[in-house]
């Protein structure tokens, strides 16, 4: 890394970190209480990926609440780009590996990980660090680069999207967990839990040609919902996404957000993103469209939120 880029990155990360704990606390202050029952949404700040995952799952009731013994589990991270972890173009490999171990520890029959990548799939899997991390954790990497891996399903709840070819591993799985990285996106404006669904389908060109924001919301109505959404915001690409141009596009914020409510997940993540780079919720149209389709709520005042600082 060039010294100039390093200094720029350090400055950005430092500024963002100063906003993180105070800013996120304010952004997610509604109905934030110490609760005995599982909260609707958890935000963990200040730790390493595995430690933050531990805290989030503990607050939500444990991994056993989401994964049962003997189940086939799919973990769907973002692995779309031939980028190293430091660029925050993909989900943090440490988080993915930790989640694989959690699922296997809960008695999962097998844990499969895949993405329909944008760059060459083998390079994405390798450079992201996810393939190596998953295999070492005991999981299975599945390709997503060929149409033969996808099966057509109906999307009866969709407004624009009425059917789609979805990866067979998801169709065959008992449960799946949605694990996006939080980042800027030129087209969708924000990549998070809802946008991460685009990596489960074969024909993404249809999305881009037929109201991208609506199609993102539509695909999320597919009847097999993730049992949990876990947002990786350990590092975030706050500009020039989805690939990024340099490390100056990245801020290290050491945060994780988890919820079963996908619209609330993206709303909370957007509020967090706004502590670094301003983006109005109206620009991220799929959030409002998802709420209109009754996928969840963007009104965080209605939810119980637990914040944890490590």
Language-model features: where?
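N-terminal and secondary-structure boundary signal
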Residues: 1-310
């Amino acid at each position: 890394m060039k010294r100039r880029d390093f200094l720029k990155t350090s400055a950005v990360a430092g500024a963002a970190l100063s906003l993180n704990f105070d800013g996120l606390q304010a952004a997610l202050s509604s109905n934030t209480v110490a609760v005995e029952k599982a909260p609707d949404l958890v935000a963990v700040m200040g730790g390493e990926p595995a430690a933050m995952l531990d805290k989030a799952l503990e607050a939500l009731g444990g991994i056993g609440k989401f994964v049962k013994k003997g189940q086939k589990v799919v973990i769907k991270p973002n692995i779309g780009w031939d980028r190293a972890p430091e660029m925050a173009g993909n989900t943090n490999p440490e988080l993915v590996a930790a989640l694989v171990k959690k699922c296997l520890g809960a008695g999962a029959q097998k844990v499969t990980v895949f993405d329909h990548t944008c760059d060459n799939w083998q390079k994405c899997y390798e450079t992201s660090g996810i393939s190596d991390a998953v295999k070492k954790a005991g999981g299975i990497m599945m390709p997503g680069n060929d149409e033969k891996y996808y099966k057509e399903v109906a999307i009866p709840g969709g407004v624009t999207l009425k059917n789609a070819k979805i990866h067979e591993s998801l169709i065959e799985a008992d449960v799946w967990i949605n694990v996006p990285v939080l980042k800027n996106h030129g087209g969708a404006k924000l990549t998070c839990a809802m946008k991460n669904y685009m990596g489960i389908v074969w024909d993404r060109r249809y999305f881009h040609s037929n109201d991208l924001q609506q199609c993102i919301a539509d695909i999320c109505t597919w009847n097999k919902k993730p049992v949990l959404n876990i947002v990786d915001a350990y590092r975030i690409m706050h500009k020039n996404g989805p690939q990024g141009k340099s490390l100056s596009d990245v801020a290290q914020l050491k945060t994780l957000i988890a919820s079963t409510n996908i619209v609330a997940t993206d709303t909370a993540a957007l509020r967090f993103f706004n502590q670094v780079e301003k983006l109005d919720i109206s620009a991220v149209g799929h959030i409002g469209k998802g709420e209109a389709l009754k996928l969840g709520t963007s009104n965080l005042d209605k939810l119980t939120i637990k914040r944890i600082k490590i």
